[in-house]
């Protein structure tokens, strides 16, 4: 079954009106697929908060702490951006070249670890639990 991006857009942003943002809004941003432009409100302010990732992937937002985690895969680290302080720090290094993250229903970080060939969960106390039963 082929995914229809327009259907997904209407379900995710039901009140969004598509309008191409002004060119200066996208300065320094590489747009690979023009459909991305349909998701940006023309009055949005885009701010760059970090440079220095070789390959960034897997952002996940934690609203209770108002921060975002993401992977810098080749540099083997997870970075953390604090929305209040506007500071980016290293959350975990090394991190087994994590490639993706999400939050489970209890708000814990679940991570795909490339070099360890596993899926892990980080407990509130920082303990890392292996969720994979079979290593490939």
PLM-predicted stretches and their roles:
Residues 75, 85-87, 126:
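Short coil turn/linker residues within repeat-based beta-strand modules
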Residues 10-44:
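Blade/loop signatures of beta-propeller domains
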Residues 79-114, 118:
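Blade-loop segments of beta-propeller domains
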Residues 134-136:
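Conserved small/polar residues in nucleotide/adenosyl-binding loops
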Residues 22-23, 51-52, 61-63, 68-74, ...:
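Conserved beta-strand positions in repeat-built beta-propeller and related beta-rich domains
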Residues 46-50, 87-92, 129-132:
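A short beta-strand motif characteristic of beta-propeller blades
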Residues 117-132:
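A generic, well-ordered mixed alpha/beta core segment in the N-terminal half of proteins
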